Amino acid sequence: MTDNSKIRVVVGMSGGVDSSVTALLLKEQGYDVIGVFMKNWDDTDEFGVCTATEDYKDVAAVADQIGIPYYSVNFEKEYWDRVFEYFLAEYRAGRTPNPDVMCNKEIKFKAFLDYAMTLGADYVATGHYAQVKRDENGTVHMLRGADNGKDQTYFLSQLSQEQLQKTLFPLGHLQKSEVREIAERAGLATAKKKDSTGICFIGEKNFKQFLSQYLPAQKGRMMTIDGRDMGEHAGLMYYTIGQRGGLGIGGQHGGDNQPWFVVGKDLSQNILYVGQGFYHEALMSNSLDASVIHFTREMPEEFTFECTAKFRYRQPDSQVTVHVRGDKAEVVFAEPQRAITPGQAVVFYDGKECLGGGMIDMAYKNGQPCQYI
């Protein structure tokens, strides 16, 4: 049996069940485990209760139960500079960002990894549903989590080979239900705690209200593609391509009585375009341009390959051809895709392996840019 006692693993503990079980499993496997709670956001709610304080109490309770030391580290400045400023800049540019991708890249696997190294870590571990597999050459491949409904490789797609070399994902081979069972069997304090939802720093807060504290909303006209005025929108940043709810025009139907969707944006004119039908023609495209192209292992500077891709979390894979030119790529779809959204991540897969991805800049229909920003 391998002696893991000389291998130090620093676990990012959030106070949730996944990271609690991560720490427990590593401890049971004989590793030298340290728990670290990251405080990334000052999230005092309207009643003056700071949820981070409650979460840290849960980390402390679990760490005491399984017998590991634990610390708290404050990354609020790093988070603001590297994730939140990016988040606001994307909204200002009319895009719909994915802060979780950036949070993993810049905070959980950069700031936290650097901090863990000061504690003498050989590896860091998190409660993400993903797997790492080392080949005979020592290259680490990131694979989808065994629980298809929970797989989080989409959000980890910007991790580098250097980061993956230092990372363990102990839950990757488990189903979420098994993780809960392990927590309950061990009597962990977090066994019955519900999963957190929403964007990491907003949590359960009202998104519109939250965003308006940081960016002034500019009201404007809501139009159909053929020029009908459908009323006023609350500010382009509040809407995303393909969105159905929140338009306030449910009662105004055309002849076909179909629901209304956001089908485009014009940032320069401050116009929100709406149309009827889930597969409205303005929502369909057959290619995209992406930047910040990044691979989880070494790839050529310029090459073309076929693979599958996801354009948003939890959607089925689609067949694509990718033309890579440095840190940019053109991605051509085998079948037209709906609501390709600038600011979101496009992530590439080869079977179970997540190859990396980039950020969507523009969608195209028959070579013409879609009016999405």
UniProtKB/Swiss-Prot annotation:
GO terms for biological process: tRNA wobble position uridine thiolation. Pfam families: tRNA_Me_trans (PF03054), tRNA_Me_trans_C (PF20258), tRNA_Me_trans_M (PF20259). Disulfide bonds join C103-C200. It is found in: Cytoplasm. ATP binds at G12, M13, S14, G15, G16, V17, D18, S19, M38, G127. Its main location: cytoplasm. Its EC number is 2.8.1.13. Residues 98-100 are annotated as: Interaction with target base in tRNA. The active site is at C103, C200. The record marks H128, Q344 as: Interaction with tRNA. Keywords: ATP-binding, Cytoplasm, Disulfide bond, Nucleotide-binding, RNA-binding, Transferase, tRNA processing, tRNA-binding. CDD domains: MnmA_TRMU-like. GO terms for molecular function: ATP binding; tRNA binding; tRNA-uridine 2-sulfurtransferase activity. Catalyzes the 2-thiolation of uridine at the wobble position (U34) of tRNA, leading to the formation of s(2)U34. Belongs to the MnmA/TRMU family. This is tRNA-specific 2-thiouridylase MnmA. It comes from Streptococcus pyogenes serotype M5 (strain Manfredo).
